[in-house]
């Protein structure tokens, strides 16, 4: 495809995206809101990380310092109903690790290739952040039940593999016959089972919510796809589920986006119905589901404030080669 000049995400397209998001929020009973940043949790996370010896130097490129900002936002917004402060620090720290990996290793995948091997063989990883992550994951078996620890470790290893797969496949055309491949990569990279699991208090019987897990995962994946789409278009990111699915299905990105929003809203309703006999689980789910939306509205990473509050000026795409929605 020939290179194009930088273009604005058009006003019409912005309104289309905004309308899809607004309809989704309405169906899931989520009024638009921005949650203030929790500096107390931020300080607690940095203090704990330093105690553990994790790299958190503010000026180092091999540091979790900036990634902790994302971890604190998702924890405060999505897990505000969780009373165990140690769990909040754990979720924020886990998110900091995976955010760092997702951002730092997009073009340096040799570390990702070696992570599972060094982890399973209990060897020291040469990258300080990944060595700290391995240490963090190994402690899961001490902190949590077998089910939780197994979920954490297996999902984290899949996630690291998915980053490498996405990088290796970014210059490979998506086949129109490979309809399920974008969804497969999405499942690998989503970490949705971990985030769904921690939505419930650890002392809540797993039997009260486990049957809703498939739809919880679909909700988390679909909501993230929906609410990260605007930012990805502005940044000309194409290695994502919406872009890959649009190519494989030979439809527009907006059509895939509408379908993702519809599936996420449907999944939300299914979870509510499954959890109705269990009031505590239902309350936890509703708080998490709303908070997961607020994670995206509250994080500058996703730029939704620009869409909902600043339609006065078109935002120019950052790269010189991109495609229309």
Swiss-Prot record:
Gene3D superfamilies: Farnesyl Diphosphate Synthase. Keywords: Lyase, Magnesium, Metal-binding. Alpha-cuprenene synthase; part of the gene cluster that mediates the biosynthesis of alpha-cuprenene and oxidized derivatives. The alpha-cuprenene synthase COP6 is the only sesquiterpene synthase identified in C.cinereus that appears to be part of a biosynthetic gene cluster and is highly specific since it catalyzes the cyclization of (2E,6E)-farnesyl diphosphate into only one product, alpha-cuprenene. COP6 is also able to perform the cyclization of geranyl diphosphate. Mg(2+) 1 binds at residues 102, 166. The keyword Transcription does not apply. Its cofactor is Mg(2+). This is Alpha-cuprenene synthase COP6. Its EC number is 4.2.3.-. InterPro entries: Isoprenoid_synthase_dom_sf (IPR008949), Trichodiene_synth (IPR024652). Pfam families: TRI5. Mg(2+) 2 binds at residues 224, 228, 232. The keyword Magnesium applies. Coiled coil: none annotated. GO terms for molecular function: carbon-oxygen lyase activity, acting on phosphates; metal ion binding. It is an enzyme of class 4 (lyase).
């Amino acid at each position: 495809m020939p290179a194009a000049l930088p273009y604005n995400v058009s006003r019409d397209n912005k309104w289309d995206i905004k309308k899809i998001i607004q309809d989704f929020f309405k169906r899931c009973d989520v009024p638009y809101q921005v949650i203030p940043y929790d500096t107390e949790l931020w300080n607690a996370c940095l203090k704990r990380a330093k105690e553990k010896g994790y790299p958190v130097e503010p000026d180092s490129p091999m540091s979790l310092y900036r990634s902790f900002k994302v971890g604190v936002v998702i924890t405060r917004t999505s897990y505000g109903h969780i009373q165990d402060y140690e769990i909040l620090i754990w979720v924020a720290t886990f998110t900091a690790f995976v955010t760092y990996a997702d951002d730092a290793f997009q073009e340096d995948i040799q570390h990702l290739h070696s992570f599972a091997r060094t982890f399973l063989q209990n060897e020291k990883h040469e990258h300080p952040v990944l060595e700290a992550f391995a240490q963090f994951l190994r402690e899961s078996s001490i902190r949590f039940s077998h089910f939780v620890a197994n979920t954490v470790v297996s999902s984290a290893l899949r996630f690291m593999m998915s980053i490498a797969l996405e990088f290796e496949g970014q210059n490979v055309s998506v086949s129109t016959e490979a309809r399920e491949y974008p969804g497969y990569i999405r499942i690998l990279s989503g970490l949705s089972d971990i985030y769904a699991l921690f939505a419930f208090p650890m002392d809540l019987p797993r039997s009260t919510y486990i049957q809703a897990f498939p739809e919880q995962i679909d909700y988390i994946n679909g909501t993230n796809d929906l609410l990260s789409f605007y930012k990805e278009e502005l940044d000309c990111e194409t290695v994502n589920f919406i872009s890959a699915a649009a190519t494989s299905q030979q439809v527009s990105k907006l059509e895939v986006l509408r379908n993702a929003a519809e599936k996420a809203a449907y999944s939300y309703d299914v979870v509510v119905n499954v959890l109705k006999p269990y009031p505590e689980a239902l309350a936890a789910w509703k708080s998490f589901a709303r908070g997961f939306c607020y994670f995206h509205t509250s994080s500058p990473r996703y730029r939704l404030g620009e869409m909902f509050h600043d339609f006065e000026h078109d935002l120019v795409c950052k790269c010189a080669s991109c495609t229309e929605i």
